[in-house]
């Protein structure tokens, strides 16, 4: 997540991961994808649908919102920074998509829950956490806190897509 731990091995691993993730992004795009590069992107999020479903939508929003760096996020409907109202609406949609495994936006007769191939993986870069601790806290509560598992699942998913 761009934070210096002082551990040279961790720094080398982070650089190798950054190169791998960038290679996967470019490869995906070469086959018709449309994932934009984010200099601040570190790791994907793994969302455990059952853990997310177990809490009320507003409770999930109240938990995740203080962990996000809104300066790194853009309201896709306006292209502008989020307002208090628009971030609530966006996170409500994120909750719906996670808790329904994408079925909230599914349109009959389409594939990938209404998303074109090009846009299929753009959602995975929407949440921008303030730092590694905020990411880890979210993953511990609603995903998988093991960064290695997250990396391997990201590689697997990107390779299959």
Q: Predicted segment positions?
A:
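Structural preference for well-ordered, secondary-structure-rich domains
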Residues: 1-161
């Amino acid at each position: 997540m761009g934070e210096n731990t002082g551990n040279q091995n961790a720094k080398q691993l982070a650089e190798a991961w950054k190169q791998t993730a960038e290679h996967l992004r470019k490869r995906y795009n070469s086959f018709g994808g449309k994932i934009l590069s984010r200099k601040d992107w570190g790791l994907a999020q793994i969302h455990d649908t059952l853990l997310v479903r177990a809490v009320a939508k507003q409770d999930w929003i109240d938990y995740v919102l203080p962990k996000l760096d809104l300066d790194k996020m853009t309201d896709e409907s306006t292209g502008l920074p989020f307002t208090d109202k628009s971030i609530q609406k966006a996170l409500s949609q994120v909750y719906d998509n996670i808790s329904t495994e994408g079925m909230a936006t599914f349109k009959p007769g389409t594939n990938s829950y209404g998303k074109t191939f090009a846009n299929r993986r753009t959602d995975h870069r929407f949440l921008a956490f303030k730092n590694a601790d905020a990411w880890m806290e979210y993953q511990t509560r609603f995903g998988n806190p093991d960064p290695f598992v997250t990396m391997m699942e990201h590689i697997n998913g990107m390779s299959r897509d």
